[in-house]
Amino acid sequence: MFSNFANGIINCGCCNLRNFAAKIMSIIGRRAGFILASVGSSLAALMASYSIIIESFVLFNLGCFLLGAGVAFSHQYRFAAVETVNKDMAPKAISIILLAGIGSAFIGPNLANISKEIISDHLYAGSYVALAILTLFSTIFLLFYEDNHRPSNFVKKNTRSYFELIAQPRFLQALIASSFAYAVMTFLMTATPISMHVMEKISLAKTGLVIQLHIAAMFLPSLITGNLIKKFGHSKIMYFGVLLFSITILTSLFEQNFINYLIALIFLGLGWNFLFISGTSLLVLSYKEEEKFKAQGFNDLIVYTVQAIASLSAGIFISLTSWKTMNLVCIIFLIIIVISTFRAD
């Protein structure tokens, strides 16, 4: 039940500091904000490593929470990319940023596995040291990033309230598509290792392969997603994302074996990609320039709060119910996505 607790704490740190990250960047700029996050994440990883050595569960969770704060800043990369291109190129810019995440499917697990024993007698403490070094690499590239942002002095009355932003059908459509895409994906992905390896006794190697291919499916479509959105429009791509999620749910109704888990998780990753990119790229069309940090921060607060809830509840759900039941619960989210998209159209 608590096997995914650390991941949930990271998500909590991420969602709780979304608005803070956006606010900081509105004051000091993108580059300074990203560098601050990079250094902070490195220190947080070292804290987590030290907590393993001294066997402090509280300190470990604090380190995970601060790592989540770094994630809150890093998710602003997609908005920074959008700001460097025309708005009609936003889907492609976001796709390129997400495509870079394909490396996480292979670099992350392998690096953690290779470095897990470099600190003798403290399994996985070395993995966090490796993470600390890895997070600093981005600082080198950020030194060459030309930030065109200037501190904003917009009067508060020039920006709409959160309620006014939500009242826009397009803004709400984008928000629901992105947040529920993350909710469904996180809810099912987090429960997969428990369902596969613990409950169905499928080998750890096969379980790991399913997760790796799932992550690849999350990011590889980014090669074409931007072009598809430009050709067919945001709403049609969202409907297609819902269809892909539906295949995942349908697969859960059959025997729970390696092949069916593989099919389900691949389509889960594909559906997330289409919904998240279309939702994020639609978001940038629904606010004014002076509202961007406010709208982006609010969007990410909702998206990753929902993700954190999904992550924390996944372990409980899979322990108390079943893989099939968890999939059926997700139908509710898909219906809401369809309704909000239809209403906006």
Give the ranges of each region predicted by the language model.
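C-terminal membrane-cytosol helix-exit motif in multi-pass small-molecule transporters
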Residues: 132-152, 340-344
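Glycine-rich segments within core transmembrane alpha-helices of 12-TM secondary carriers
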Residues: 92-110, 302-310
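Cytoplasmic helix-loop-helix junction between adjacent transmembrane helices
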Residues: 61-99
